[in-house]
Regions:
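Short loop->beta-strand "edge-of-pocket" segments that line small-molecule binding or catalytic clefts
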Residues: 16-23, 27, 37, 115-132, ...
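Flexible hinge/capping segments at coil-to-helix
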Residues: 94-96, 105-123, 206
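Periplasmic-binding protein-like
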Residues: 23, 97-107, 171-213, 229-236
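Ligand-binding cleft/hinge of the Venus flytrap
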Residues: 29-33, 44-54, 93-94, 118, ...
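Short helix-initiation/N-cap motifs at beta->coil->alpha
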Residues: 56-68, 111-112, 144-157
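Ligand-binding clefts/hinges and TM-proximal coupling segments of bilobed small-molecule sensing domains
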Residues: 1-10, 131-148, 213-236
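Extracytoplasmic small-molecule ligand-binding "clamshell" domains
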Residues: 2-81, 86-88, 218
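A ligand-binding cleft/hinge motif common to bilobed small-molecule-binding domains
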Residues: 64, 68, 80-89, 135-138, ...
Length: 236
């Protein structure tokens, strides 16, 4: 069924769907700016197909850049973790995938569980503006958040006690560096959703939510993740 004209106008006011894709999250997007792939690319193209408009992809390398593009109206949709700070400026669908934030530490560290991290004198490396940066900034009371181009970059450059990151890439990082280990359990569950500007027509936001919920429920998201070789949890 074609989307109502009101929805098309609200979500694609320039006659194309401008979608911002974060290549910095390898679970959700892969490839190059010239040839991106992954579940977020598939979702963008499917939303565009249902709207009946072409899709223009803008690729960035950090969630904060995706957020800025959507919040400032330079992109019509983006793919972001649901966070209270972001929800003040963008409208979210329900999550289409769940990923985990985990810590990594040296093998000899006294940190045994995620709860051990929040102590005075502990410094945690994070990717600036990432979902887990926002979460840890909001929740840590004693440990210090140190931001960098990536949590592992900050961890190495500043000889930090802890690195934070998304489970899949952080696990791969640890696997190539003897002397490090991943801390279990996760410290947060990251709820990835589709975002659009909070000023968009409520009917269009509701339509987008329905579409994403349907694509999550009918196996579209799971199939896309499988094609891209990603192991992530689909809600429901």
């Amino acid at each position: 069924m074609a989307a109502p004209a009101q929805v098309v106008t609200a979500l694609a006011p320039q006659g194309v769907l401008r979608a911002v894709v974060n290549l910095g999250n390898p679970v959700l997007a892969q490839g190059t700016p010239e040839a991106p792939s992954g579940v977020t690319v598939d979702l963008a193209r499917e939303v565009g197909r249902r709207l009946g408009v072409p899709v223009v992809l803008e690729c960035v390398d950090a969630a904060r850049l995706s957020f800025a593009a959507v919040a400032e109206g330079r992109a019509d949709v983006g793919f972001l973790a649901v966070e209270p700070e972001r929800a003040a400026q963008v409208a979210f669908t329900e999550p289409y995938v769940l990923i985990e934030g985990v810590f990594a530490v040296p093998e000899g560290s006294w940190v045994r569980t995620a709860d051990d991290v929040d102590r005075p004198g502990v410094r945690v490396g994070v990717k600036q503006g990432s979902a887990y940066d926002l979460f840890l900034t909001r929740t840590l009371q004693h440990a210090e958040v140190v931001r960098g181009a990536d949590g592992t970059v900050a961890f190495e450059e500043h000889a930090l006690e802890v690195a934070a990151g998304i489970r899949q890439p952080l696990t791969r990082y640890v696997a190539t560096r003897p002397g490090l280990r991943v801390v279990e359990p996760r410290f947060t569950e990251i709820r990835q959703a589709v975002a659009t500007g909070r000023d968009r027509d409520p009917a269009a936001v509701a339509w987008l939510r329905d579409v994403v919920a349907g694509l999550t429920a009918d196996g579209f998201v799971a199939a896309s993740l499988e094609r891209s070789g990603q192991d992530a949890t689909v809600p429901g």
